Amino acid sequence: MEIYIEQLKNQDAEDLFNFELTNKSFFETMVPSRGSNYYVYEYFQKQLAELLKEQTEGISYFHLIRNTEKEIVGRINLVDVDKEKRIGSLGYRVGEKFTKKGVAASSVKLILAQARVYEINEIHAMTTTNNIASQIVLEKSGFSREKEAETTTVDLNGGNVNFVHYIWRTTKD
């Protein structure tokens, strides 16, 4: 599937809200819930305003993943950016009907290229031990598996899962 990424903007609010609402149950099989308030549009708009403020300040960079029909197929973000150390953390999610089409791998490749523009040289990522697909995407994208977090566990669908930590570092041209 051909995709591109673009920076999140306020005008994306309604489409993004619908994307999140449509994929709520699917996402919650892999990551902890965002809470019921997140799916109330007025609350969502406030959260979006906070994200856009972070983006303006250069603390985080939020992107939508879109297909050639301009439909939102996922999100990919660089957050907790430390400009002095040139470090950030990666997060992404792909909508249920767009999985197994190479969207995650393609969008990670695109965000790593964008990281150079943002002057980020090291990116940390975490995924749960049960999310094998995400582990494969990260490893094939040049991330190194660092360790399984011993103290970072979450309750997911009635069971505890640990996080696996990854790091990507830019190579000098």
Regions picked out by a protein language model, each given a short descriptive name:
Residues 2, 7-15, 19-26, 62-173:
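Acyl-donor (CoA/ACP) binding surface of acyl/acetyltransferases
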Residues 28-49:
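Conserved GNAT-fold acetyl-CoA-binding loop/helix
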Residues 36-37, 49-63:
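A short helix-loop-beta-strand connector motif used in the catalytic cores of GNAT acetyltransferases and
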